[in-house]
């Protein structure tokens, strides 16, 4: 692992020794999240990673995906930043410990729940409406 990555996430090479590989973990994750809506922040990056593994593992992540970055751009179009930190600050969510998977997932869930009323004020109340509005944002065009 690169030093910069270790500094952000705190995960070291020694922590990964003896752990299952992505080829073992991803099928279990795929089964776990089947028939759900995935919610994440800047999820295009994560979905690209999953897409790169789909063919070799015989998987397909085809469920709907809501991205809090895109939803923030819909709910707050005049804001310059839609980073997770900026959204949390804007919505009054405690930053706490960040940059580990559980803390980031919890923060994203809190952001998602707080964005729902702002989206509802714009008449966005269904999954389809949220997906369609998200795809109209500039950020939806970013590819990884």
PLM regions: where:
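Conserved non-catalytic scaffold segment of RNase H-like nuclease domains
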Residues: 1-63, 77-99, 139
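Generic recognition of well-ordered alpha-helical segments
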Residues: 71, 87, 107, 111-114
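Generic detector of well-ordered alpha-helical segments enriched in charged/polar residues
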Residues: 6, 69, 85, 128-132
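Conserved beta-strand -> loop -> alpha-helix junction used to position metal-binding or nucleic-acid-contacting
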Residues: 60-72
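Ser/Thr-centric signal marking residues that sit
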Residues: 36, 68, 108
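Acidic two-metal-ion nuclease catalytic site recognized across multiple nuclease folds
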Residues: 109, 113-144
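Conserved catalytic/binding loops enriched for acidic/polar residues
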Residues: 104
């Amino acid at each position: 692992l690169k030093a910069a990555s270790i500094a952000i996430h705190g995960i070291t090479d020694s922590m990964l020794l003896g752990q299952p590989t992505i080829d073992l973990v991803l099928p279990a994750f795929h089964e776990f999240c089947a028939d759900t809506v995935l919610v994440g922040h800047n999820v295009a990056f994560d979905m690209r990673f999953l897409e790169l593994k789909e063919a070799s593992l015989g998987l397909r992540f085809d469920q709907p995906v809501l991205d809090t970055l895109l939803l923030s751009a819909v709910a707050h179009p005049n804001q310059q930043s839609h980073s997770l930190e900026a959204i949390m600050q804007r919505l009054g969510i405690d930053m706490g410990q960040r940059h580990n998977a559980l803390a980031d997932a919890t923060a994203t869930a809190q952001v998602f729940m707080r964005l729902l009323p702002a989206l509802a004020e714009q008449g966005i109340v269904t999954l389809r409406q949220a997906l369609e509005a998200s795809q109209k944002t500039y950020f939806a065009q970013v590819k990884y």
